[in-house]
């Protein structure tokens, strides 16, 4: 029988299905997380107090978890290996184009809808993150992902890397507007935090969580479980292990599961030259967009 995982003081649990999928049936973010944080603001178990605990203590505690240690070691090794970042940054900057012009040229009404959604969603998400008080990194290009999901009406979307859930919220909202499609997400919680599973997807609205297929063991374990189940993938968003080897592994793993028309979005392509090398080797069109000093690569449109 699949075990239950109770995520700390926020109360409702996530039920593990199979070997790592999380069937998210109980909403615990947005209004409820804000209420919980307010009620516990002064208590010893508050999220603010959790955030102040030693990073090293949390690293050690999570390293003792058998399913965490191998992934942690791979991530630490990748960060210690200096990437060819300057070369990648120069290439991305040289090839960048305006995402506004791109979106408006394909479908002005849908691009306007995407911007309207993002303008409403961003302050709500920021409010949740401010209340939590835990650094969860930046999100993907959620405006672009909403737009692409609405534009292409994918049957199956795969994303690697969830964190707070900016991109997940964009895709799930757009799929709901489309009236069909499913999202399969692979993540590995921030191991510097205590009980890090509680924060994964924390900005995703409660109403969008039913049927969200979320796996939390890292890409190498998650993709082995997701790919036989999800069907052919029409939209793939890569935003997890940014190392050269990590990107190579993921693309090799999903290659035979992508539809011929699959749209591929890769975040942080300026971290190393993987995206440049990949698109030049495969041939065909590609696009590069700048966002907040970082760069996103797109293939398929």
Q: What function would you assign to each model-found segment?
A:
Residues 105-139, 150-151:
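Class I SAM-dependent transferase core
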Residues 43, 131, 135-301:
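S-adenosylmethionine/decaboxylated-SAM
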Residues 20-23, 60, 106, 125, ...:
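Prokaryotic Sec-type signal peptides and long signal-anchor helices
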Residues 95-99, 105, 115, 121, ...:
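Alpha-helix boundary/capping residues
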Residues 3-6, 12-14, 19:
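Intrinsically disordered, low-complexity segments enriched in serine/proline and basic residues
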Residues 23, 27-115:
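Membrane-proximal basic amphipathic "stem/tether" segments
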Residues 1, 21, 27-30, 55, ...:
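Intrinsic disorder/low-complexity signature
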């Amino acid at each position: 029988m699949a075990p239950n995982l109770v995520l700390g003081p926020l109360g409702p649990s996530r039920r593990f299905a199979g070997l790592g999928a999380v069937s998210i049936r109980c909403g615990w973010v947005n209004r409820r997380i804000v209420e919980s944080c307010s009620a516990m603001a002064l208590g010893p178990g508050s999220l603010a107090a959790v955030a102040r605990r030693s990073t090293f203590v949390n690293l050690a505690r999570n390293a003792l978890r058998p399913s965490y240690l191998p992934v942690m070691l791979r991530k630490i090794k990748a960060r210690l290996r200096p990437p060819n970042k300057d070369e990648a940054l120069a290439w991305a900057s040289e090839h960048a184009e305006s995402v506004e012009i791109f979106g408006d040229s394909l479908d002005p009404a849908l691009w306007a809808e995407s911007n309207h959604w993002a303008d409403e969603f961003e302050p709500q998400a920021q409010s949740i993150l401010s209340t939590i008080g835990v650094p969860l990194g930046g999100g993907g290009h959620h405006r672009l992902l909403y737009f692409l999901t609405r534009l292409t009406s994918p049957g199956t979307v795969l994303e690697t890397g969830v964190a707070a859930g900016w991109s997940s919220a964009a895709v799930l909202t757009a799929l709901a507007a489309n009236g069909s499609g499913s999202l399969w997400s692979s993540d590995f919680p921030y191991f510097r935090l205590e009980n890090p599973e509680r924060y994964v997807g924390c900005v995703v609205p409660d109403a969008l969580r039913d049927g969200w297929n979320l796996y939390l063991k890292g890409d190498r374990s998650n993709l082995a479980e997701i790919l036989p189940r999800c069907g052919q993938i029409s939209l793939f968003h890569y935003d997890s292990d940014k190392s050269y080897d990590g990107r190579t592994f993921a693309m090799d793993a999903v290659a035979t599961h992508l539809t011929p028309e699959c749209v591929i979005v890769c975040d942080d392509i300026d971290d190393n030259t993987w995206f440049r090398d990949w698109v030049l080797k495969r041939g065909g069109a590609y696009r590069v967009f700048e966002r907040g000093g970082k760069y996103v690569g797109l293939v398929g449109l």
